[in-house]
Structures are given as C-alpha cells and as structure tokens.
From Swiss-Prot:
An example molecular function term from Gene Ontology annotations: RNA binding
Subunit-structure text: Component of the large ribosomal subunit. Mature ribosomes consist of a small (40S) and a large (60S) subunit. The 40S subunit contains about 32 different proteins and 1 molecule of RNA (18S). The 60S subunit contains 45 different proteins and 3 molecules of RNA (25S, 5.8S and 5S).
Keywords, comma-separated and alphabetical: Cytoplasm, Ribonucleoprotein, Ribosomal protein
Biological role stated in the UniProt entry: Component of the ribosome, a large ribonucleoprotein complex responsible for the synthesis of proteins in the cell. The small ribosomal subunit (SSU) binds messenger RNAs (mRNAs) and translates the encoded message by selecting cognate aminoacyl-transfer RNA (tRNA) molecules. The large subunit (LSU) contains the ribosomal catalytic site termed the peptidyl transferase center (PTC), which catalyzes the formation of peptide bonds, thereby polymerizing the amino acids delivered by tRNAs into a polypeptide chain.
Source organism superkingdom: Eukaryota
Family: Belongs to the universal ribosomal protein uL5 family.
GO CC terms: cytosolic large ribosomal subunit
Subcellular location(s) per record: Cytoplasm
Source organism of the structure: Candida albicans (strain SC5314 / ATCC MYA-2876) (Yeast)
The name this protein goes by in its record: Large ribosomal subunit protein uL5
Major location (coarse): cytoplasm
C-alpha cells in the first residue's frame, strides 16, 4: 500500500466544482441567482430546466428553474476552501458518494464573503466536487477510449482520507 500512495499518478485531485442554485421558478429570482453565481465564480452561469412537471410545486416541464456554473483549476480550489470554511471543515460521511465525489450545501451566499446587496437578496447553494486521478480521461475521450482498473478509480474511502489530510477537516459518522 505504501508504494501505491507515493505514485504521482495515484494522487487525487479536484477535476471540477459545480455550484448550483435551484430557485424553483423562472423569472426575476432566477436572474438574481445567476448574478450571485457570476459574482462568486467570475463565469457566466447556465440555466437548468425542469425534467418533468410537479404540480404541487407549480413547476412545469422545461421551465428554467435553476442556474449552475462549473469551475475548474485553482479557482475551484479557492471557492471550495471558502465553502468549507462556512461548514467549519466538517462534512458527514453521507456527503461522499461511492464513486469518490462529494457535495454539500450552504444556506446563505453572503457567508462566502460576497457583499450583501438588497436588490439581489440571499440565496443558498449546493457545492458538488468531482474527484479524479491523472489518466482517468481515457475512459471519457472519444478516440482510443479505454478502461482503467478498479485500483485507479476513485472511491469513498480514498476521498475521505484526501479530504481529512488536505483540509485538516473531520468527517462525522452520523
């Protein structure tokens, strides 16, 4: 096991961070939520449509109800650090998926250091982090697609260990 942990190709890294705000309705609130994500990430957010009609919530199929933005690289790590600071570097083990990704939510975007603007309001958001290792692209590319072995795939235990050492955080077993 010690040989595997010292291999540079085995090191976990953040492939992408997805920030999502689901408003539940189209219109003015959705555009204000998009402004929040644009302030936070510096990128233009994309609007997401409802998959199907839910009459109890007043949602129609194909109605734009959410905005999200995908952030990669050092900017993703910096935004994730701010989000984890809000959560006080504590996540539950349920926040980690079997494939090694994790996510969490915050209640107020102003906790991230964004100045409060009364015309925008306060929005909560979800953070989704996709983890990966070097060389994992061979399973997703179009040309010369291949597979990777089970030992190289990310899993829940590896991600939890990486999370604890990287951010000096704790994972609660609730």
């Amino acid at each position: 096991m010690s040989d595997k942990s010292q291999n540079v190709m085995r090191e976990l890294r953040i492939e992408k961070l997805v920030l999502n705000i689901c408003v539940g309705e189209s219109g003015d609130r959705l555009t204000r939520a998009a402004k929040v994500l644009e302030q936070l990430s510096g990128q233009t957010p994309v609007q997401s449509k409802a998959r199907y009609t839910v009459r109890t919530f007043g949602i129609r199929r194909n109605e734009k109800i959410a905005v999200h933005v995908t952030v990669r690289g050092p900017k993703a790590e910096e935004i994730l650090e701010r989000g984890l600071k809000v959560k006080e570097y504590q996540l539950r083990s349920k926040n980690f998926s079997a494939t090694g990704n994790f996510g969490f939510g915050i209640d107020e975007h102003i906790d991230l250091g964004i100045k409060y603007d009364p015309s925008i309001g306060i929005y909560g958001m979800d953070f989704y982090v996709v983890m990966g290792r070097a060389g994992a692209r061979v399973t997703r590319r179009k040309r010369a697609r291949s597979t990777i072995g089970n030992s190289h795939k990310t899993n829940k235990e590896d991600t939890i260990q990486w999370f604890k050492t990287r951010y000096d955080a704790e994972v609660l077993d609730k």
